[in-house]
A protein has these predicted regions:
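Alpha-helical transmembrane segments of multi-pass integral membrane proteins
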Residues: 87, 185, 189, 193, ...
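Membrane-cytosol interface segments of multi-pass membrane proteins
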Residues: 1-163, 173-174, 178, 257, ...
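Specific aromatic-rich, kink-prone transmembrane helix
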Residues: 51-54, 132, 136, 186-194, ...
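Aromatic-anchored, glycine/proline-accented short structural segments
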Residues: 168-223
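Flexible, active-site-proximal loop/turn residues at the rims of small-molecule/cofactor binding pockets
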Residues: 37, 108, 195, 267-268
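Short hydrophobic alpha-helical membrane-embedded segments
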Residues: 16-26, 203-212, 262
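Hydrophobic, membrane-inserted alpha-helices
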Residues: 25-33, 134, 158-166, 187-191, ...
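Juxtamembrane helix-break-helix junctions at the cytosolic face
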Residues: 139-143, 197, 241-244
Length: 330
Protein backbone atom coordinates (compact mmCIF):
# COMPACT_ATOMS: atom_id res chain seq x y z
CA UNK A 1 0.00 0.00 0.00
CA UNK A 2 2.81 2.39 0.93
CA UNK A 3 4.64 1.59 -2.31
CA UNK A 4 1.47 2.31 -4.27
CA UNK A 5 1.01 5.71 -2.59
CA UNK A 6 4.67 6.57 -3.16
CA UNK A 7 4.36 5.65 -6.83
CA UNK A 8 1.25 7.81 -7.21
CA UNK A 9 3.05 10.72 -5.57
CA UNK A 10 5.98 10.32 -7.95
CA UNK A 11 3.61 10.35 -10.91
CA UNK A 12 2.14 13.65 -9.72
CA UNK A 13 5.53 15.33 -9.26
CA UNK A 14 8.42 16.20 -11.53
CA UNK A 15 11.91 17.47 -10.79
CA UNK A 16 12.62 20.83 -12.39
CA UNK A 17 15.93 22.67 -12.54
CA UNK A 18 15.92 25.19 -9.69
CA UNK A 19 17.16 28.00 -11.92
CA UNK A 20 14.14 27.51 -14.17
CA UNK A 21 11.76 27.79 -11.22
CA UNK A 22 13.59 30.88 -9.96
CA UNK A 23 13.44 32.53 -13.37
CA UNK A 24 9.71 31.92 -13.62
CA UNK A 25 9.14 33.15 -10.07
CA UNK A 26 11.37 36.19 -10.58
CA UNK A 27 9.68 37.37 -13.76
CA UNK A 28 6.26 37.00 -12.12
CA UNK A 29 7.33 39.16 -9.18
CA UNK A 30 8.91 41.72 -11.51
CA UNK A 31 5.72 42.13 -13.53
CA UNK A 32 3.50 42.08 -10.43
CA UNK A 33 5.59 44.84 -8.82
CA UNK A 34 5.93 47.05 -11.89
CA UNK A 35 2.27 46.72 -12.81
CA UNK A 36 1.13 47.48 -9.24
CA UNK A 37 -0.62 44.12 -8.92
CA UNK A 38 1.36 43.29 -5.79
CA UNK A 39 4.56 44.75 -4.38
CA UNK A 40 7.05 41.86 -4.39
CA UNK A 41 10.48 43.39 -5.08
CA UNK A 42 13.68 41.41 -5.51
CA UNK A 43 12.97 39.43 -8.66
CA UNK A 44 15.47 41.25 -10.89
CA UNK A 45 18.39 40.88 -8.49
CA UNK A 46 17.54 37.21 -8.00
CA UNK A 47 17.52 36.85 -11.77
CA UNK A 48 20.96 38.48 -11.95
CA UNK A 49 22.40 35.86 -9.59
CA UNK A 50 20.82 33.13 -11.71
CA UNK A 51 22.57 34.64 -14.75
CA UNK A 52 25.91 34.32 -12.96
CA UNK A 53 25.12 30.76 -11.93
CA UNK A 54 24.19 29.67 -15.44
CA UNK A 55 27.14 31.43 -17.02
CA UNK A 56 29.48 29.50 -14.72
CA UNK A 57 27.52 26.34 -15.38
CA UNK A 58 27.45 26.44 -19.17
CA UNK A 59 30.31 28.66 -20.31
CA UNK A 60 33.12 27.86 -17.88
CA UNK A 61 33.46 24.22 -19.02
CA UNK A 62 34.05 25.22 -22.67
CA UNK A 63 37.75 24.56 -23.27
CA UNK A 64 38.22 26.31 -26.60
CA UNK A 65 38.76 30.05 -26.10
CA UNK A 66 37.37 30.80 -29.54
CA UNK A 67 34.24 28.77 -28.94
CA UNK A 68 33.78 30.20 -25.44
CA UNK A 69 34.05 33.79 -26.69
CA UNK A 70 31.67 33.07 -29.52
CA UNK A 71 29.17 31.46 -27.15
CA UNK A 72 29.35 34.47 -24.84
CA UNK A 73 28.90 36.96 -27.67
CA UNK A 74 25.95 35.02 -29.08
CA UNK A 75 24.39 35.08 -25.62
CA UNK A 76 24.84 38.85 -25.48
CA UNK A 77 23.51 39.30 -29.01
CA UNK A 78 20.37 37.29 -28.30
CA UNK A 79 19.54 39.67 -25.46
CA UNK A 80 21.02 43.00 -26.57
CA UNK A 81 19.80 43.10 -30.18
CA UNK A 82 16.08 42.55 -29.39
CA UNK A 83 16.28 45.05 -26.52
CA UNK A 84 17.93 47.73 -28.65
CA UNK A 85 15.36 47.25 -31.42
CA UNK A 86 12.50 47.37 -28.92
CA UNK A 87 13.91 50.47 -27.20
CA UNK A 88 14.55 52.20 -30.52
CA UNK A 89 10.97 51.46 -31.62
CA UNK A 90 9.64 52.84 -28.34
CA UNK A 91 11.79 55.96 -28.69
CA UNK A 92 10.54 56.46 -32.24
CA UNK A 93 6.91 56.02 -31.14
CA UNK A 94 7.20 58.58 -28.37
CA UNK A 95 8.43 56.82 -25.24
CA UNK A 96 10.64 59.03 -23.09
CA UNK A 97 13.76 57.00 -23.75
CA UNK A 98 17.08 58.66 -24.37
CA UNK A 99 20.08 57.70 -26.45
CA UNK A 100 21.54 56.07 -23.35
CA UNK A 101 18.60 53.68 -23.19
CA UNK A 102 18.90 52.73 -26.85
CA UNK A 103 22.66 52.14 -26.49
CA UNK A 104 22.15 50.17 -23.24
CA UNK A 105 24.24 52.72 -21.36
CA UNK A 106 21.50 54.55 -19.46
CA UNK A 107 22.81 53.18 -16.15
CA UNK A 108 25.62 55.70 -16.51
CA UNK A 109 24.43 58.26 -19.08
CA UNK A 110 20.78 58.60 -18.10
CA UNK A 111 19.02 60.87 -15.60
CA UNK A 112 19.34 59.93 -11.93
CA UNK A 113 15.62 59.60 -11.21
CA UNK A 114 13.68 56.39 -11.82
CA UNK A 115 10.30 58.03 -12.44
CA UNK A 116 10.87 58.21 -16.21
CA UNK A 117 11.06 55.47 -18.83
CA UNK A 118 14.83 55.73 -19.23
CA UNK A 119 15.52 53.04 -16.64
CA UNK A 120 13.16 50.38 -18.03
CA UNK A 121 16.03 48.23 -19.28
CA UNK A 122 18.54 48.61 -16.45
CA UNK A 123 18.62 44.84 -15.89
CA UNK A 124 19.36 44.14 -19.55
CA UNK A 125 22.15 46.71 -19.44
CA UNK A 126 23.73 45.04 -16.41
CA UNK A 127 23.30 41.62 -18.04
CA UNK A 128 25.04 42.72 -21.24
CA UNK A 129 27.86 44.57 -19.48
CA UNK A 130 28.71 41.69 -17.14
CA UNK A 131 28.51 38.91 -19.72
CA UNK A 132 30.82 40.89 -22.02
CA UNK A 133 33.27 41.55 -19.17
CA UNK A 134 33.35 37.93 -18.01
CA UNK A 135 33.68 36.66 -21.58
CA UNK A 136 36.66 38.97 -22.08
CA UNK A 137 38.25 37.93 -18.77
CA UNK A 138 37.96 34.24 -19.60
CA UNK A 139 39.66 34.88 -22.93
CA UNK A 140 42.86 35.80 -21.05
CA UNK A 141 44.87 32.55 -20.70
CA UNK A 142 46.27 33.34 -17.24
CA UNK A 143 42.83 34.17 -15.85
CA UNK A 144 41.32 31.11 -17.47
CA UNK A 145 44.03 29.00 -15.83
CA UNK A 146 43.22 30.50 -12.42
CA UNK A 147 39.51 29.78 -12.88
CA UNK A 148 40.28 26.20 -13.85
CA UNK A 149 42.67 25.72 -10.93
CA UNK A 150 40.50 27.44 -8.31
CA UNK A 151 36.87 26.96 -9.41
CA UNK A 152 35.57 28.05 -6.00
CA UNK A 153 38.40 30.26 -4.80
CA UNK A 154 38.46 32.50 -7.89
CA UNK A 155 34.79 33.61 -7.73
CA UNK A 156 35.14 33.89 -3.94
CA UNK A 157 38.00 36.38 -4.35
CA UNK A 158 36.14 38.16 -7.14
CA UNK A 159 33.06 38.39 -4.92
CA UNK A 160 35.10 40.07 -2.20
CA UNK A 161 36.40 42.56 -4.77
CA UNK A 162 32.98 43.40 -6.18
CA UNK A 163 31.63 44.06 -2.68
CA UNK A 164 33.95 47.08 -2.55
CA UNK A 165 32.11 48.57 -5.54
CA UNK A 166 28.86 48.86 -3.60
CA UNK A 167 30.40 51.15 -0.99
CA UNK A 168 29.74 54.88 -0.72
CA UNK A 169 32.80 55.95 -2.72
CA UNK A 170 31.36 54.18 -5.80
CA UNK A 171 27.86 55.68 -5.66
CA UNK A 172 28.63 58.18 -8.43
CA UNK A 173 26.56 60.86 -6.77
CA UNK A 174 23.24 59.04 -6.34
CA UNK A 175 22.81 56.56 -3.50
CA UNK A 176 19.56 55.13 -4.89
CA UNK A 177 21.11 54.09 -8.20
CA UNK A 178 23.59 51.85 -6.41
CA UNK A 179 20.87 49.19 -6.69
CA UNK A 180 20.77 49.34 -10.47
CA UNK A 181 24.21 50.21 -11.82
CA UNK A 182 26.47 47.52 -13.22
CA UNK A 183 29.48 48.04 -10.98
CA UNK A 184 27.50 48.27 -7.73
CA UNK A 185 25.40 45.12 -8.22
CA UNK A 186 27.97 42.98 -10.03
CA UNK A 187 28.36 41.11 -6.75
CA UNK A 188 24.92 39.52 -7.26
CA UNK A 189 26.17 38.08 -10.54
CA UNK A 190 29.41 36.87 -8.94
CA UNK A 191 27.46 35.43 -6.01
CA UNK A 192 25.52 33.30 -8.48
CA UNK A 193 28.83 32.24 -10.03
CA UNK A 194 30.07 31.29 -6.55
CA UNK A 195 26.97 29.20 -5.88
CA UNK A 196 27.59 27.02 -8.93
CA UNK A 197 30.86 25.35 -7.73
CA UNK A 198 29.59 25.03 -4.14
CA UNK A 199 29.67 21.25 -4.32
CA UNK A 200 30.43 20.25 -0.71
CA UNK A 201 28.63 20.80 2.57
CA UNK A 202 31.38 23.11 3.79
CA UNK A 203 31.28 25.26 0.65
CA UNK A 204 27.50 25.40 0.74
CA UNK A 205 27.56 26.57 4.34
CA UNK A 206 30.11 29.28 3.51
CA UNK A 207 28.18 30.39 0.42
CA UNK A 208 24.87 30.42 2.30
CA UNK A 209 26.40 32.60 5.00
CA UNK A 210 27.76 34.97 2.35
CA UNK A 211 24.33 35.18 0.70
CA UNK A 212 22.66 36.18 3.95
CA UNK A 213 25.40 38.52 5.15
CA UNK A 214 25.89 40.37 1.86
CA UNK A 215 22.21 40.89 1.10
CA UNK A 216 21.18 41.99 4.61
CA UNK A 217 20.80 45.76 4.74
CA UNK A 218 21.72 46.41 1.11
CA UNK A 219 18.23 47.57 0.11
CA UNK A 220 17.16 48.84 3.52
CA UNK A 221 13.94 46.89 2.93
CA UNK A 222 13.88 43.52 4.75
CA UNK A 223 11.10 41.86 2.68
CA UNK A 224 13.13 42.31 -0.52
CA UNK A 225 16.27 41.05 1.19
CA UNK A 226 14.45 38.01 2.58
CA UNK A 227 13.02 37.16 -0.83
CA UNK A 228 16.41 37.28 -2.57
CA UNK A 229 18.17 35.50 0.28
CA UNK A 230 15.70 32.61 0.41
CA UNK A 231 15.84 32.17 -3.36
CA UNK A 232 19.64 32.08 -3.47
CA UNK A 233 20.07 29.83 -0.44
CA UNK A 234 17.57 27.46 -2.05
CA UNK A 235 19.76 27.40 -5.16
CA UNK A 236 22.82 26.69 -2.99
CA UNK A 237 21.30 23.53 -1.52
CA UNK A 238 18.89 22.29 -4.18
CA UNK A 239 19.81 22.06 -7.86
CA UNK A 240 16.39 20.58 -8.65
CA UNK A 241 13.04 21.02 -6.92
CA UNK A 242 9.91 18.87 -7.11
CA UNK A 243 6.77 20.56 -8.41
CA UNK A 244 3.36 19.26 -9.46
CA UNK A 245 3.68 17.88 -12.95
CA UNK A 246 0.72 19.92 -14.15
CA UNK A 247 2.59 23.22 -13.65
CA UNK A 248 5.86 22.15 -15.27
CA UNK A 249 4.88 23.48 -18.69
CA UNK A 250 3.75 26.91 -17.41
CA UNK A 251 6.95 27.24 -15.35
CA UNK A 252 9.15 26.27 -18.30
CA UNK A 253 7.28 28.63 -20.63
CA UNK A 254 7.53 31.60 -18.26
CA UNK A 255 11.22 30.91 -17.69
CA UNK A 256 11.94 30.65 -21.40
CA UNK A 257 9.97 33.79 -22.17
CA UNK A 258 11.34 35.74 -19.19
CA UNK A 259 13.64 37.97 -21.24
CA UNK A 260 10.89 39.03 -23.63
CA UNK A 261 8.42 39.56 -20.79
CA UNK A 262 11.01 41.74 -19.08
CA UNK A 263 11.62 43.76 -22.25
CA UNK A 264 8.03 44.18 -23.37
CA UNK A 265 5.81 44.36 -20.28
CA UNK A 266 6.41 48.08 -19.77
CA UNK A 267 4.98 48.72 -23.23
CA UNK A 268 2.27 46.06 -23.49
CA UNK A 269 0.55 46.49 -20.14
CA UNK A 270 -0.06 50.28 -20.23
CA UNK A 271 -1.42 49.96 -23.77
CA UNK A 272 -3.88 47.27 -22.72
CA UNK A 273 -5.06 49.24 -19.68
CA UNK A 274 -6.39 51.93 -22.03
CA UNK A 275 -8.72 49.52 -23.85
CA UNK A 276 -9.40 46.68 -21.38
CA UNK A 277 -10.59 46.31 -17.78
CA UNK A 278 -7.69 46.25 -15.33
CA UNK A 279 -7.92 42.51 -14.58
CA UNK A 280 -7.85 41.55 -18.24
CA UNK A 281 -4.98 43.92 -18.83
CA UNK A 282 -2.87 41.93 -16.38
CA UNK A 283 -3.76 38.69 -18.14
CA UNK A 284 -2.99 40.40 -21.42
CA UNK A 285 0.60 40.82 -20.34
CA UNK A 286 0.94 37.19 -21.41
CA UNK A 287 1.00 38.62 -24.92
CA UNK A 288 4.71 38.91 -24.17
CA UNK A 289 4.88 35.11 -24.24
CA UNK A 290 3.55 35.17 -27.80
CA UNK A 291 6.10 37.86 -28.67
CA UNK A 292 8.81 35.57 -27.28
CA UNK A 293 7.54 32.58 -29.26
CA UNK A 294 7.77 34.46 -32.56
CA UNK A 295 10.94 36.40 -31.78
CA UNK A 296 12.75 33.32 -30.47
CA UNK A 297 12.23 31.49 -33.75
CA UNK A 298 13.49 34.49 -35.71
CA UNK A 299 16.51 34.83 -33.42
CA UNK A 300 17.29 31.11 -33.68
CA UNK A 301 17.29 31.31 -37.45
CA UNK A 302 19.43 34.46 -37.44
CA UNK A 303 22.00 33.01 -35.02
CA UNK A 304 22.16 29.78 -36.98
CA UNK A 305 22.75 31.73 -40.19
CA UNK A 306 25.44 33.82 -38.48
CA UNK A 307 27.09 30.68 -37.16
CA UNK A 308 27.22 29.10 -40.62
CA UNK A 309 28.45 32.32 -42.16
CA UNK A 310 31.21 33.35 -39.75
CA UNK A 311 32.46 30.16 -38.10
CA UNK A 312 32.38 26.42 -38.45
CA UNK A 313 31.41 25.90 -34.84
CA UNK A 314 28.20 24.43 -33.41
CA UNK A 315 25.55 27.00 -32.56
CA UNK A 316 23.71 26.61 -29.26
CA UNK A 317 20.01 27.02 -29.86
CA UNK A 318 19.58 28.81 -26.53
CA UNK A 319 21.71 31.51 -24.95
CA UNK A 320 23.88 30.13 -22.18
CA UNK A 321 22.01 31.85 -19.40
CA UNK A 322 18.53 31.02 -20.67
CA UNK A 323 18.59 27.23 -20.74
CA UNK A 324 15.21 25.49 -21.07
CA UNK A 325 13.74 23.58 -18.16
CA UNK A 326 15.37 20.37 -17.02
CA UNK A 327 12.57 18.01 -16.10
CA UNK A 328 12.81 14.49 -14.77
CA UNK A 329 10.38 12.12 -13.15
CA UNK A 330 10.48 12.39 -9.38
Amino acid sequence: MLDCLTHQRHRRLANVDTTVVLRALAICTIVATHMRLRFVPGGAHTLLAVVGFNLARFMMPIESTRQRVRAGLLTVARVAVPTVLWAWSGWFLGASYGIGTVLLLNNYLGPPGHSSDHWHFWFIEVFVHLVVIVTALLAVPSIRQLVRRFPYGFPLALFAGTLLLRMEWAWLGDWYNIRFRTHSIAWFFVLGWLIQPSDSTYKRLVTSALCVASIAGFFDYPPREWFIGVCLVTLVWFREVSVPRVIVWPIATLASASMWILISHFTIWPSLVEVMPLGWAYVGTLVAVLVWFVADRVTDATCALAGRTFAKLPVRRRPLVLEPATVATA
